Amino acid sequence: MMYEVKHLRINYKTLEEFKKFREYGLQELSMLEDLNAKISENEITSPFYGIYLGDSLVARMSLYKRDKKYDQYFQPPQSYIEVWKLEVLAEYQRKGLGKALVEFAKTFNLPIKTSPRVKSSEFWTKMGFVPVTYDIDRDLGENPIVWFPKGVTEQKQTAD
């Protein structure tokens, strides 16, 4: 089944939709605080994307574009996408919604970085993500994984 990924608006309706995820989800995946901050800052651009079934938001993620000057992961150095807080409501899991969100992120044709949470490593592996060589200074206790578009490889860290 094909799902349409929509760019979510920063408004109080989206805030109400996000409350369903907090009710069922894990605190570390909560986007309520992120959305509240964006509403109060009156931001126009939203990093939030989601999939609706009918009138209900059932899957969502945040996408942040990182500038080339901050790239410590990809060769050649370039701008990349960071996926945060991808979540599908429990009753809609294993129906291809998470895959649809990741495939949407890949359409930007930029490398993608994320840090898997809550027993999701198998999902990310199926989506073509691989672990990077851990660097204690760069990764700060995270275990990032990445997806490489054609022509991109892992940036090799140099010893200081």
Describe the predicted segments one by one:
Residues 117-142:
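Conserved active-site alpha-helix within GNAT-family acetyltransferase domains
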Residues 158:
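Acidic, metal-coordinating catalytic segment for phosphate/diphosphate chemistry
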Residues 84, 89, 117:
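Residue-level recognition of the GNAT/N-acetyltransferase active site
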Residues 88, 93-107:
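Conserved acetyl-CoA-binding loop-helix of GNAT-fold acetyltransferases
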Residues 26-85, 93, 136-144:
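Conserved acyl-donor/pantetheine-binding loop and adjacent beta-alpha core of acyl/acetyltransferases
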Residues 95-99, 142-150:
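Accessory recognition modules or surfaces
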Residues 102, 107-119:
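Conserved GNAT acetyl-CoA-binding A-motif
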Residues 1-39, 52:
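Short amphipathic alpha-helix that is part of the acyltransferase structural core
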